[in-house]
Amino acid sequence: MKILGRWLKLLLLGLIGLFLVWQLWLLGWVLLWGWVNPGETRFMAIRLAELRQKVPEAQLKQQWVPYERISIHLKRAIIAAEDAKFVDHEGFDWEGIQKAMEKNQKKGRFVAGGSTISQQLAKNLFLTPTKSYFRKVEEAIITLMLENLWSKKRIFEVYLNVIEWGNGVFGAEAAARHYYNTSAAQLGPEQAARLAGMVPNPRYYDRNRSAQGLGRKTAIILARMPAADVP
């Protein structure tokens, strides 16, 4: 029994050690990407692998642009649509999380997540789309790293450049060119609001650009944009 207990203790210490090494590895990338633009996120790599199963030579559409070359309308639209308290919270919108939990409980299934921009970025940079308790814990840890080591402006800049906006389309510049044949800097208010409305389900809206639901979301986002605070 003592031998078994000793082995269990060693196993536990080993798992803790691996967990800490993993966190240090993540921390290293977070520190680097605070100054260097990410080339490819974990989520982008997953989507590219999926595309290449059907088309081996497939490539993602993505072009990095500095924060200053992204339309203020798109910045306001994303804040209005995804995270109205972004500039004020420290990574987590507890009120939004509570509302999402109540909505899920009422529906009896998962229909809302309540994730902030920082949480969404943490998932996109490092994690897989699979849902698990470990993944939620990891997401929270990475979110805290981002919030404490990056400025809000840097978080938002990276987010706008790496989020999915269609089938193989990532980032504001690629989205602007894919849908409107213009640059991210030249997006108007309605174009920006429509792009922001696509964020929760971009591949669906890429296929169904005239969806009625998207039109309603666009109108709501447009109405909220003047009150949106951007970093």
Curated annotation (Swiss-Prot):
Belongs to the glycosyltransferase 51 family. This is Biosynthetic peptidoglycan transglycosylase. It is a single-pass membrane protein. It is found in: Cell inner membrane. The gene is mtgA. GO terms for molecular function: pentosyltransferase activity; peptidoglycan glycosyltransferase activity. Keywords: Cell inner membrane, Cell membrane, Cell shape, Cell wall biogenesis/degradation, Glycosyltransferase, Membrane, Peptidoglycan synthesis, Transferase, Transmembrane, Transmembrane helix. It is an enzyme of class 2 (transferase). It comes from Dechloromonas aromatica (strain RCB). Peptidoglycan polymerase that catalyzes glycan chain elongation from lipid-linked precursors. Its main location: membrane. One of its GO terms (biological process) is cell wall organization. InterPro entries: Glyco_trans_51, Lysozyme-like_dom_sf, PBP_transglycosylase, Pep_trsgly. GO terms for cellular component: peptidoglycan-based cell wall; plasma membrane. The chain crosses the membrane at residues 10-30. Its EC number is 2.4.99.28. It catalyses: [GlcNAc-(1->4)-Mur2Ac(oyl-L-Ala-gamma-D-Glu-L-Lys-D-Ala-D-Ala)](n)-di-trans,octa-cis-undecaprenyl diphosphate + beta-D-GlcNAc-(1->4)-Mur2Ac(oyl-L-Ala-gamma-D-Glu-L-Lys-D-Ala-D-Ala)-di-trans,octa-cis-undecaprenyl diphosphate = [GlcNAc-(1->4)-Mur2Ac(oyl-L-Ala-gamma-D-Glu-L-Lys-D-Ala-D-Ala)](n+1)-di-trans,octa-cis-undecaprenyl diphosphate + di-trans,octa-cis-undecaprenyl diphosphate + H(+). Pathway: Cell wall biogenesis; peptidoglycan biosynthesis. PANTHER family: BIOSYNTHETIC PEPTIDOGLYCAN TRANSGLYCOSYLASE, MONOFUNCTIONAL BIOSYNTHETIC PEPTIDOGLYCAN TRANSGLYCOSYLASE.
